[in-house]
């Protein structure tokens, strides 16, 4: 009897420990999460615009400073091996990917790997992503993974966000449309193509606030952040404004925009795969590229 009592106590403790060690199921962000992301993106856009206005005349461009360029480099194929797009996606869209200005890329859903300063993350789970942005952000303007602050699109868990420094991004979910035949006149894209970029600081701030909650036009919702949905096609306009972005590393001041391509692009992309770990693979096509405007300071 005494042995049975001890055994029962031991078994109870063991089961409690096992339950405590279980990893809780991963929660998927919902509409409130998306709203929070959009709000943070809008506030960040306004704050960073203010920084550009204050400091735009203090730093000259210099892309020859030793030690700085690696932060803005394109990662090698070996470095991005852990994010190689699924073969079935590449095969399925092989004909589409033979067209000009198209591509396929897998975004890392682990936002801990995406530091905003361009440095690599020290997180153990990010050991396979030791390059700027950690695979969480992509620039269609330079066709490469990028540090988040210079990207056109980033993935935060399952939320797509466009809110880089000195950039105004607009996302729209076009539903389960085929990407192959979309053009600048397509529903949902037509608004992006005809949208007039902000010319002043006040217009920029107003637009950021509107995109925080969303702009409804012709049956489509345009926002800074949208939930990534499998098989959905999205439109994106990314306006990377001209100007200066003063930065300093180890006491050396430089203009970050000297290491970037400041263009105004319109892209369509389709979510071709969402992996079990949340990584999102997209196929994309650039529809238009032009020179970016410059915000007029007061």
Regions found by a protein language model. Name each.
Residues 1-4:
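Positively charged n-region of N-terminal signal peptides that target proteins for export
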Residues 6-14:
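Bacterial N-terminal signal peptides
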Residues 9, 148-150, 182, 242-244, ...:
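Residues in flexible loops and secondary-structure boundaries
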Residues 13, 152, 246-248, 271, ...:
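Generic alpha-helix signal with a bias toward terminal, lower-confidence helices
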Residues 15-20:
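Sec/Tat signal peptide C-region and signal peptidase I cleavage site
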Residues 22-225, 252, 298:
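N-terminal "domain-start" segment
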Residues 199-277:
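Acidic, glycine-rich flexible loop segments
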Residues 278-298:
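Short solvent-exposed strand/turn elements
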